[in-house]
Amino acid sequence: NLFKCIDADRTKVILLGDRFQLAAVGPGSFFADVSDLKGPLADNISHLTKSWRFDASKALGKIAEASREGEELIVTDAFVENSDNDPRVDNPLRLHEDAPKGDLSASFKKWFENELSSPLKVIAELRRNRTEKSLHDAAHELARLYFSVGVLASNREGPMSAQAVNAFAESIFVKEGIPYPAFRPMIVRRNDSMLEVYNGVIGVVMPGQSWFEGAEFDATQANVYFPDSARLVRFGLIGHIEPAFAITIHQSQGSEYHHVAVLMPQDPNSGLATRELFYTAVTRVRDERNGKQTTYGSLDVFGKLTVVKKALRTPVQRQGGLIRRIVEAKDRMQKTRR
């Protein structure tokens, strides 16, 4: 629909993206097709090689390139060589192969509880001294902590899934006596142009202003703080919203985090273990730069090495007919010019 609205004689269109990431849900692989360096649009393609998210010469850069090319040995060696690196020197890369006991593995629960400890400390301090804090300052601090960590799952439901992680997080919040939905990260699941909130946007639920003035928590007064726009939107007005302590790898595209946990499929033959899925997940990691000092991001992969290897040697094969249609369109244009 977008291209139908464009005046081709007066408009130049630039498409920017990563052809090696997961394609959108649905048939075909639009961006991979149009950006194929051997395809019919090759003369119109510029291949960008410098990464601004992480250092290509460090461990993460090497594992990203190797996963893109399906180089199993380089990826597996990287996990062994960089398991205990100082984050000021290089990217820590860790592989946790223990099987889930119930919905989640013991190693993941330990990792997650450690990462959740910082937001919980901020929440505890807020609950003790809420009248001394401003709503926006508190929301900004919580968002900063939540959005520095990405828990990215291959599966939406089942063992080692986004749903399992969100349920585990909720059990921790209940144990801490934190009323729902206060202080939880939430993801919007449907566009709402009236509220100007859109599918995939994540915010943090904050109590209403009265809570910061000493009143009891009132869920009807809760707001969702969206850090990208620094806006507060009433929680009850957003019809389709759900917890986002963990999201799927598909949902994470376009996002970046200083620490990333990847929950791989349990079954190597499920069809989810693909090269594009693994590459998309590992390239969500970002380094943090403060002047001349760089703190390198970390990657923890939870799953069997056999599943990682299966993913690396399984590129997605999708046929949508777009290449054929582009070739036909070019042929028609050339005949018209003659």
Residue ranges and their predicted role:
Residues 14, 44-49, 152, 261, ...:
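Hydrophobic/aromatic beta-strand patches that form the interior of the parallel beta-sheet core
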Residues 5-11, 19-186, 192-195, 333-338:
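Conserved helicase motor core of P-loop NTPases
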Residues 201-338:
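C-terminal accessory regions
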Residues 170-177, 190, 243-249, 271:
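Short alpha-helix capping/helix-loop boundary micro-motifs
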Residues 179-184, 198, 252, 258:
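Residue-level recognition of short, solvent-exposed, well-ordered loop/turn junctions
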Residues 3, 35, 49, 166, ...:
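Generic hydrophobic alpha-helical scaffold/packing signal
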Residues 13, 24, 199, 250:
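Short glycine- and Lys/Arg-enriched binding-loop motifs that mark or flank ligand-binding interfaces
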